Every structure is written in structure tokens, then in C-alpha cells.
Amino acid sequence: MSASTISSFRSAIVPVLLLGLVAGCDKQVSGNRQAEATPTASAPVAAAPKADKIDRTHKGDPAPSVSFEGPDGKPMTLARFKGKPVLVNLWATWCGPCVKEMPTLDAAAADITVAAISQDKDRPTIDAYFAKNGFQRLKPYLDKNVALSVTYEASLPMSILFDSTGHEVWRSTGGMDWTSAEAKALLAEAK
């Protein structure tokens, strides 16, 4: 296959994957697709994870070397977390299930490192969201090029648990209550 054919294929596949990313989020938000979703007091808490929602088929795969922005706005990769287990959560401010699970991710971050990596397009959007919601433990990571979502062919929210050596333990798609007993047991699988 020639280099131009490969380049054409990549140019065609990226928009399709991005469309799948947006379509995969059951955003439950009306109005502007890019409008920030907000959790409400009457909104149900994300469901506890179910064993059948946990995908272990990639167990042992190394973390990708895809670059994204750290909380300081500087480029980084998942390798920065090597040496400790980390729960990577791909989310966006316009994704209803993502927004619902953020408070429980913040609570879970008391026991495990959580990298909530926004798939939004700009830092001011997520900085404003974090300031408005007053998270105690989560930090605003940003993947404005959605490179991780493309790598994982992700529907939002997607969570991937990595062990301390940087290898995948499991992944899950859909919102969860990260404070549930089942979620705590799943997170304890990373060493």
C-alpha cells in the first residue's frame, strides 16, 4: 500500500471515529451539543458497575504513548503515572453520563489516582467546569485532539484501569458510581 493510500485512509477514518465518539455518548442533554451538561440534585447517580460491563480482553496491554495536556497545560503521556495504579476516565462537559459520574470519580480519587481526561476542544471550557464544580481531588487533563478516544475507539464516558506497571487491567464504557462497593472492588484489582 502506498503512503498516499495510507494517508487517504487515515484522513477518512478519523472523522468516522470522531462521529462514533459523539454518537456513543448518551448525552441526555438538550440544546446545543457542545453546551456544558450540569448535574442536578434530582439527577440519578450513575449506576454501579456491572461485571458484564467490564471488558478484560485487553488485560496486559501497555498504556498508549499518546500525548495530551496535563493540568499545567504542558504535554504529557500516561507514562507519567507509571509506578502507581491509575484510573483513566475519558469524558466531556457536553456528555450527560460523564458529568453525572464526575463527583463519584472525585470521591474515588481519595483511594486511587484518577486521570479525568477531557475530550473537549479547549482548556477554558474544562477549567471553568472544574472551578464551578469545586472538585477536591480531580485535576483538569485535556485531550483536545481526542487522540485517546481515537486510540480506544471510545464512546464516552470510558474508563480504563492501569496497574502500577502501566498495563491495562480492564476497561468500561458508560457512567458508573465509583463510590459503590463493586466499583471499589474493581479498582482494588490494580496493584
List where the protein language model places each region:
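Thiol/disulfide oxidoreductase modules built on the thioredoxin-like
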Residues: 131-137, 142-190
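A short beta-strand-turn-helix
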Residues: 55-61, 65-86
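Conserved redox-active cysteine motifs that mediate thiol-disulfide chemistry
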Residues: 82, 86, 90-107
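Structural microenvironment flanking redox-active thiols in thiol-disulfide oxidoreductases
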Residues: 99-133, 144-150
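Alpha/beta-hydrolase fold active-site loops
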Residues: 85-86, 111, 167
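Hydrophobic beta-strand anchors of alpha/beta hydrolase catalytic cores
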Residues: 87-88, 114, 159
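N-terminal targeting signals for export/organelle localization
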Residues: 1-65, 181-184, 191
